[in-house]
Every structure is written in structure tokens, then in C-alpha cells.
Amino acid sequence: MPPGGGGPMKDCEYSQISTHSSSPMESPHKKKKIAARRKWEVFPGRNKFFCNGRIMMARQTGVFYLTLVLILVTSGLFFAFDCPYLAVKITPAIPAVAGILFFFVMGTLLRTSFSDPGVLPRATPDEAADLERQIDIANGTSSGGYRPPPRTKEVIINGQTVKLKYCFTCKIFRPPRASHCSLCDNCVERFDHHCPWVGNCVGKRNYRFFYMFILSLSFLTVFIFAFVITHVILRSQQTGFLNALKDSPASVLEAVVCFFSVWSIVGLSGFHTYLISSNQTTNEDIKGSWSNKRGKENYNPYSYGNIFTNCCVALCGPISPSLIDRRGYIQPDTPQPAAPSNGITMYGATQSQSDMCDQDQCIQSTKFVLQAAATPLLQSEPSLTSDELHLPGKPGLGTPCASLTLGPPTPPASMPNLAEATLADVMPRKDEHMGHQFLTPDEAPSPPRLLAAGSPLAHSRTMHVLGLASQDSLHEDSVRGLVKLSSV
């Protein structure tokens, strides 16, 4: 260390240490302020969550609220206007049975609407890229070539060949009986249908509750309709039909609502009873996947061959756990599900993003060189000690532009003879160009040399002295290069 330089070095070292040591001390406080996010907040499907992710529904919930209003209003009118009269005239068991049916209907409805129907998690970017490469190899195409459309796998279930289709949105091969819901934008295991009346998909995890809901609602609708008619008949026997309607106007509204809804509800319950007894889904029945019209060899491989067994499996079997941890916390290194690309390979997309990043780094590196060259090169010392000057390392330059090979510089139009120049000739020129910015020896750019990132660089303490015409021409060329780069 040269004498007298201890003070500046200490200041430099102190400022450098204080700059780097302050950032780690601030990071823990910043992390404490940021609350941990749960997975339901970044769920890729079109769903709505309530109660911190405990309740999961579809976004289209308008018809669900209509279902709630119809059930609550009809049942409330029945308990308020019909049950008091029927409990006195017939039996107190009528309001008790109606209450049990009502609570059972509401419980199964909410259980169906608020639960996970069996959503399958989407593939992560790494899983999707690996699967895309497997498909490319299986189809005999390279990553940049055209891939033929068939994306299916075939599995054998109880002697029946079942095709597994590839989902371009979830980036997975759907398991048997699974399908993608276009409204919720999720692949649902054992997908039955999307029911707007319950505001959710009906799948493997909530099908039994859906069936119990429509079955109990059928009993409740028939029960209310029957005893509303009984109430009107008993009153009409005492005071006449018109007076009976005037005494209990709510009974008319209940009878109309029940009359128009009982047929569809009872019919839907009967249809799903048939599906359960044959171990089918609504989706399979509509598509005719296991229809007898396709031949005797086309049979349902999921049926146990016994109606009682099929019903027990559908209604009394164990409920599979949810495959999406919607209330779990997001880890910093947890990969997010892959975004849909409509058939474009993730490998190609990742490669193109890497190429764009490399191009941006190269452009930034070239900008640094041109910005340094744009400043006129003037130095008060008229001595020349080296033919090669080294460019100081830039901390922002990274791979793949870590090594820069600079082309040979364009010789100026006129080069002054340094042997004949004197200090008296140089100083007036310096005074004439006070508007220019002068470079220190450490900031001067170097002539051509392969510079490796991270290697120690030796800096020359002497510079070439250029003439006025050379400085102006170099300045103009550098400005043109910067203008061209800014348009990239």
C-alpha cells in the first residue's frame, strides 16, 4: 500500500462492507411482513374458494342460489302455514318428518356444493416437459418437427380396451372415466357431469352426496305437495274451497312450485338410480360408451355384475382423499403447474426463452462497450507504454456473453506523432474541449483481446492521445451504434 493511501482505502472498505452487510439484515424483516400464501390462492382452475380454502365451488353460482331460495322459501312456507294446522288435525309427526327431510336435503346439498369433486392436479413444468419428450420419442419426431395428432394410451380393464386421452390443459394423461370440465377448467376423476343446480362438478368424491340430495329432495317435494293438498281439502270441507284458499294463500304457492318441480326431480332420481345399479356415469351414458348397440363384445368393464354390489360400492364405499392440497402453504421452491400451450411442447418454449435471454445479455454487453467508446479519449499524459489495453470487468455480464472478442479498431483519419508532440501542444487542445468528458485510466476501453469473466485484469496507466478529427469521428460512429442498438 502506498504511503498516504491508508485513509481512502479504509473509507472504501468501510463503505463496501456497510453496503453488503445491510442487505442480509433487512431481508428477515421483509420476509416477516410477507404472509405465506396458500395453494388455493394460485389454483389454476376456474373455481371460487371460501373460508380460507375449505369451501370449493364453481364460478357460476347463480343457479345454486336459486336452488337454495326455492328450497328455503317452499319449506319455510310449509312450516309456517301448513304444519300448525296439520299437527293439530292429523298428527304432530308431520312437521317432525318434514324437518328431518329438510335438514337432510340441506346437508347433502351443501356437502355436494362445497366439496372437491375429485379434481386431478396439473403437471408441473418439469413433468410436462418430460411427458412431451416421451410423446415425441413415441411418435418418432424430433422436438422441432411436426408431431402427429394422436395422443392416446390404451389400457385393458377386465378384458376391455380403454383409451386414456391426453389433456392439453392439465398436461396429463387422464385416468379411466376422468374428463375435463370446460366450465371449471379441471380434470375430474370419475366425472359424471357439471351440475349448475349445486354449483359444482359431480365426480368421484361427491357423487354419493349428490345422489342422496336429489333422492331426499324428491321425498321432501312429494311430502310437501301431498300434505299441502291435504291441508286445502280439510279446510275446504269446513269453510269451502275459496275460503280455504283465502285462509291459507301460501298453500297455493307451495302447490304450484312442487307440482312443476316434482316431475323433473323424481325423474332425475330415477335416472341416477339406474346409473348406480349399472355402475355407469352420466358422461358414459350420454356418449354411449358401453351401449349394447355396439355389439355384445362392448360391455361395461366397471360393473360388478350385481345390482346390490354396484349400489354398495357407489354409496357405501370409502371416500378417496383429495388430490389437491388447497389449504397447504406454497413453498418457495415448489414448481407451479404448467400453463396450457395447446399442443406446443414445453421443451421448445423453454429453449426459445433461453435464446431470448442470451440475446438480451449480448445486446446489453455490446451497449456497455459502445457507451465506453462513445466518450472521446483524451489524457493529459503524453506517454505510451503498451499496445494493448484491458477492459475492466463488468459485474453485470454473465453467461453466455462472459467472453467478448472485440474486432480490430478502425484506424483514425490522422494520428499525431507522439514523438514530436509536446505537453504545450496538448494542453491547449484540452482547454478547447472542456465540454467533453474525460476518462480515467481505469475506465478506458481496450483494443481487441479475449476477456474471460472473473479473470484479473491488469490496467495500463497510459493512454493514446487522439486528434480532434479522430475524436469526433469516433464519437459519431459510437452514437450511431447506440441508436441502432436502442431500436433492437
Swiss-Prot record:
It is an enzyme of class 2 (transferase). Residues 82-89, 230-255 are lumenal. The active site is at residue 195. One of its GO terms (biological process) is peptidyl-L-cysteine S-palmitoylation. It is found in: Endoplasmic reticulum membrane; Golgi apparatus, Golgi stack membrane. One of its GO terms (cellular component) is Golgi apparatus. Its EC number is 2.3.1.225. Widely expressed. It catalyses: L-cysteinyl-[protein] + hexadecanoyl-CoA = S-hexadecanoyl-L-cysteinyl-[protein] + CoA. It comes from the Eukaryota. Residues 1-60, 111-208, 277-488 are cytoplasmic. It is a multi-pass membrane protein. InterPro entries: Palmitoyltrfase_DHHC (IPR001594), PFA4/ZDH16/20/ERF2-like (IPR039859). The modification Phosphoserine is found at residue 455. The DHHC domain is required for palmitoyltransferase activity. Palmitoyltransferase that could catalyze the addition of palmitate onto various protein substrates. May have a palmitoyltransferase activity toward the beta-2 adrenergic receptor/ADRB2 and thereby regulate G protein-coupled receptor signaling. May play a role in cell differentiation and apoptosis. Belongs to the DHHC palmitoyltransferase family. ERF2/ZDHHC9 subfamily. This is Palmitoyltransferase ZDHHC14. The gene is ZDHHC14.
